[in-house]
Swiss-Prot record:
Lumenal domain ranges by topology: 30-40, 183-201
Family: Belongs to the DHHC palmitoyltransferase family. PFA4 subfamily.
Lineage: Eukaryota, Fungi, Dikarya, Ascomycota, Saccharomycotina
Keyword terms: Acyltransferase, Endoplasmic reticulum, Lipoprotein, Membrane, Palmitate, Transferase, Transmembrane, Transmembrane helix
Annotated compartments: Endoplasmic reticulum membrane
Cytoplasmic topological domain: 1-8, 62-161, 223-446
Organism in which the protein naturally occurs: Candida albicans (strain SC5314 / ATCC MYA-2876)
Protein name from the UniProt record: Palmitoyltransferase PFA4
Name of the encoding gene: PFA4
C-alpha cells in the first residue's frame, strides 16, 4: 500500500540520508581499506549514477497534457457547454464519458472523452489528475512519495534507472560485505586487538540496512518491470483486479450494457463467447433517429438480449483484451526507449504519452467494443439515474440465494460474497488495501 507521509518533504530527505549513509559510510569506514583504487572508482560511479537518476526522477515532469490537446474527431462528438462556460473553455461531455473516436480500419473503436475542470483541458487516454502534483499526468503510474513526484510517461525511464542503479550498487556492496564477514569468521580465533573495531561496527550496522534496501527495491523493480511488460500502469493493474473480482456482478454488467447502448445506439448487445469459440456475427442496423434518448439508452442497457442473463455465461475475464498491450518488446520500447538508451541518464520513452497505440489483438478480437475500462470512469450518476431504476438495488440487497447455494467451489463462493463485489470504482480496494487515492488520483477530476 502506498505510504502517506505527514510531511511530504520527508519522502525525499529519508532516501537521501539512506543513500548517503550506505554509499559514503561504507566507503569511508570499510571499502577504502580493502578495495583497489580502480574498484573504489567503480563503486563511486555506481553511487553517482544513483544520485543522477534520483534527481532526474524528482525534477522531470511526469508528463503534462499539451494545452492545445483535443481528442480526435472531437468535433463530431455531441458536446454541450455548462451553464457557466458559455465561452467554450469548460466543455464537458453530455454524459460522464462520451464516444469520441471511431477507427474505420478496425470497426467501431472508441475512447472516453474526459475533461479536467481543474486543468481546464481534455484528458488523453490513460491520464489522470494527481491531487498532489495538481496536474493531469500522461500515462500516470502512481504518485511516488519517495521522489515527491508522479511516475508517468516522461519520467518512468528515470525512475526505473534509479531503482536499477540502487539494486546494482547495493548488490555490489553486499558482495564486498559478505566477503569481509567470511574473512572475519575465518579469523575469529585471532586476538581482538588485531581487528579494526570501527570497521567491524560499521559492517554490523550497514549490512542489514543494505540488505533491506536491496531486497525491497528489487521487489519494487520486478513489480514495475512486470507491469511494463504487460503494457499496464499500476493504476491499470488495479483496474484489472477490480474487474476480475466484480466479473460476476450484475451491477458491472448493467454498466457495461448501458455503456454499449450509449455508444452504439441502435445496435443490440453482442453475443459474447470464450476465446475457444467464434463470436457470432450480429447484423447492426444503424439508427440515426435520436428520439427519446434517455428511454432508449435505458432499454438498450437492459433489454438488448432479453433471452440471456445479465452476466454472460461464456465470457470470462481472460477473454477481456487490454487495448494497450502491444507485446513485451514494444511495451518495453514504448515505456523505456530502445535498449541502447536504458542506461543513458537522459534516455526517454518512445511514446509521447497522449497518443497511445492500440494493439492489433484488441482491434481484431475485442468483443465488447468498448473503451477502457468497459464499465466507464464515473459510475455514480449512471447508477442513480439508470441502474437503480432497473432493479440494481434489489439485486444488491437480495442476492439470489439459490444461485449461491448451488456454488460448490469455495474460492468462487468467497468471491461472490466479497463486499467489494458491488462497490463503485471510486470505493474499490484491492487485496493490498490500495484504492485510487493511494495512487495519487484525484477522484473528483478523474
Amino acid at each position: 500500500m502506498a505510504v502517506q507521509l505527514k510531511w511530504p518533504i520527508l519522502g525525499v530527505i529519508i532516501p537521501c540520508i539512506i543513500i548517503f549513509s550506505l554509499s559514503y559510510g561504507s566507503h569511508y569506514f570499510i571499502l577504502r581499506h580493502h578495495l583497489t583504487m580502480k574498484q573504489q572508482l567503480i563503486y563511486e560511479f555506481y553511487v553517482t549514477m544513483i544520485w543522477i537518476s534520483y534527481l532526474l526522477a524528482i525534477y522531470t515532469n511526469p508528463g503534462r497534457v499539451p494545452k492545445n490537446y483535443k481528442p480526435s474527431l472531437a468535433s463530431s462528438t455531441r458536446i454541450e457547454q455548462t451553464e457557466d462556460d458559455s465561452d467554450g473553455l469548460g466543455l464537458e461531455s453530455r454524459e460522464d464519458e462520451t464516444l469520441i473516436r471511431e477507427e474505420p480500419i478496425s470497426g467501431d473503436r472508441c475512447e472516453w472523452i474526459r475533461y479536467c475542470k481543474k486543468c481546464n483541458n481534455y484528458k488523453p487516454p490513460r491520464s489522470h489528475h494527481c491531487k498532489i502534483c495538481q496536474q493531469c499526468v500522461l500515462q500516470m503510474d502512481h504518485h511516488c512519495p519517495w521522489t515527491l513526484n508522479c511516475v508517468g510517461n516522461n519520467n518512468l525511464p528515470h525512475f526505473m534507472r534509479f531503482l536499477g542503479w540502487i539494486i546494482w550498487g547495493t548488490g555490489y556492496l553486499m558482495i564486498q560485505l559478505i566477503k569481509l564477514i567470511i574473512n572475519y569468521y575465518e579469523n575469529s580465533n585471532m586476538p581482538h586487538y588485531l581487528f579494526n573495531k570501527t570497521e567491524l561496527v560499521a559492517i554490523i550496522a550497514i549490512t542489514p540496512l543494505n540488505f533491506f534496501v536491496f531486497a525491497s527495491i528489487l521487489v519494487l523493480f520486478i513489480r514495475c518491470l512486470i507491469n511494463i511488460c504487460k503494457g499496464m500502469t499500476q493504476i491499470e493493474i488495479w483496474e484489472w483486479e477490480r474487474l476480475e473480482l466484480q466479473w460476476s456482478s450484475k451491477r458491472l454488467w448493467r454498466l457495461i450494457r448501458f455503456n454499449y447502448g450509449r455508444l452504439h445506439k441502435g445496435k443490440p448487445f453482442p453475443e459474447l463467447n470464450t476465446w475457444t469459440n467464434t463470436t457470432n456475427n450480429v447484423n447492426y442496423n444503424d439508427n440515426d433517429d435520436d428520439g427519446d434518448e434517455d428511454v432508449e439508452l435505458i432499454n438498450l442497457a437492459t433489454n438488448n438480449n432479453e433471452d440471456s442473463t445479465i452476466v454472460p455465461q461464456n465470457f470470462t475475464i481472460d477473454d477481456l483484451i487490454f487495448p494497450y498491450n502491444l507485446g513485451i518488446w514494444k511495451n518495453l520500447v514504448n515505456a523505456l526507449g530502445y535498449p541502447y538508451m536504458w542506461l543513458i541518464p537522459f534516455g526517454k520513452p518512445k511514446s509521447n504519452g497522449y497518443q497511445p497505440q492500440i494493439s492489433q489483438d484488441y482491434k481484431q478480437d475485442d468483443q465488447l467494443n468498448l473503451p477502457w475500462p468497459p464499465d466507464g470512469i464515473r459510475q455514480k450518476e449512471i447508477e442513480i439515474n439508470v441502474l437503480q431504476q432497473q432493479g440494481y438495488q434489489r439485486d444488491r440487497e437480495e442476492e439470489d440465494e439459490e444461485e449461491l447455494r448451488s456454488i460448490r467451489n469455495y474460492q468462487e463462493l468467497r468471491r461472490r460474497l466479497d463486499p467489494r463485489l458491488n462497490v463503485q470504482r471510486s470505493d474499490f480496494i484491492n487485496d493490498m488495501g490500495e484504492g485510487l487515492t493511494d495512487f495519487g488520483v484525484d477522484e473528483d477530476s478523474d
